[in-house]
Every structure is written in C-alpha cells, then in structure tokens.
Amino acid sequence: MRQYEVMYVLRPDLEEEKVKSNVARYSDVVTNYGGEISKLQEMGKRRLAYEINKFREGYYVLMNFKANSDAVAEAERLMKINDDVIRFMFVRDEK
C-alpha cells in the first residue's frame, strides 16, 4: 500500500448534511478497499483563486490515507461523476 493525499472542493451551496455525506462517501471508499485514513481535515468554505463552474467559493476537504491503487481509482471515478465535486487532485506521497 502507498501513501496518498487528496484535496477536493465541493460546491459552496451544499447543505451541511450533503457535505457530510460526500465526505463520508469518499472515506468509506478508502476503508472498504482496505485502506487506512491517517488524516481527514474539513477546511470549510474558502474563496477560490479563480471561478470554477461559476462558483467563487468552495468547501475544501483534505484527506491523507494509505491504500492500494484500486481504492484511488474508485474514489477518482466517483468524484468525476459527482456534480457536487467541482475540483479534485490525488497525489502519491513518495515518503
């Protein structure tokens, strides 16, 4: 298993309940594939550097985890098809 970090930005107009369900969904994907979450940080609503899909703000979430590539591929697939996620990036930690 390798160490990964993902930062994703959710739409700012989501209700708190919907934000929590999205965070739980991606956390569950990692754990269901046998991964371990070392850090989950909800950074809250922040201003974007530039407009994305006509939004000037977004709800930022940072997750550090250890998992195999199947978990990353599944989480990435789910983020691509979810309209609530306006931007995401996975980074493999080389440590």
Swiss-Prot record:
Lineage: superkingdom: Bacteria
Entries under Pfam families matching the protein: Ribosomal_S6 (PF01250)
GO function term, MF aspect, one: structural constituent of ribosome
Isomerase is among the record's keywords: no
Entry's Gene Ontology cellular component terms: cytoplasm; ribonucleoprotein complex; ribosome
Gene Ontology biological-process entries: translation
InterPro entries, per database record: Ribosomal_bS6 (IPR000529), Ribosomal_bS6_CS (IPR020815), Ribosomal_bS6_sf (IPR035980), Ribosomal_S6_plastid/chlpt (IPR020814), Transl_elong_EF1B/ribsomal_bS6 (IPR014717)
Alphabetical UniProt keywords: Ribonucleoprotein, Ribosomal protein, RNA-binding, rRNA-binding
Keyword flag Isomerase: no
Gene3D superfamilies: 3.30.70.60
General function of this protein: Binds together with bS18 to 16S ribosomal RNA.
Family: Belongs to the bacterial ribosomal protein bS6 family.
Protein name: Small ribosomal subunit protein bS6
Gene: rpsF
